[in-house]
C-alpha cells in the first residue's frame, strides 16, 4: 500500500488530499529495469485513476483497504478480516535546502513510522538537501531482524541506478 498526495501543485489550499494505492512491487521480475518500469507504470496508472475521482470516491475507495483495521478498532480485538496488504511504502518530500540548528547543519533526516495491526513492514523514504534516506520499521514477530533488509535495499538501489544509467 502506498499513500499518495492528490493535492494539485501550487493551489495554496490547506488540508490534506490523500489516497492510497495498491502497487505491484514486481518482486517476481529479475531484471531491475523491468521491475522499475512495472512499479512506475503501476503508480502512474493508480494516480491517474485517483485524480479522476471525486474526493468522496477517493475516500470510499481508500476506506475499503482500511476496513479490516476499522473492524478491529470497533471490536477491540483482532477482527475476522486481514488487511489486503502488510507492507506500506511512503515517500515524504523534505526541504531542498540545508537545515541548521544553532549553526549545526542537519546531516540526515530519518523517517519513522508506526506499524498498525496486520502490518509487517513500513518503508518510508524522505528527501532533504539533495539526498534521500530510508527508514524501515517492522513488526518484531514478522520481521525479527531488519538489518539484512538494509543490505538488500542498498544492493537493489545499486542495481536500479545501474539499470537507469546513474
Regions found by a protein language model. Give the residues of each.
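Short proline/glycine-enriched turn/loop segments at secondary-structure junctions
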Residues: 9-11, 75-79, 112-113, 124
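Small-residue-rich loop/turn and linker elements
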Residues: 1-13
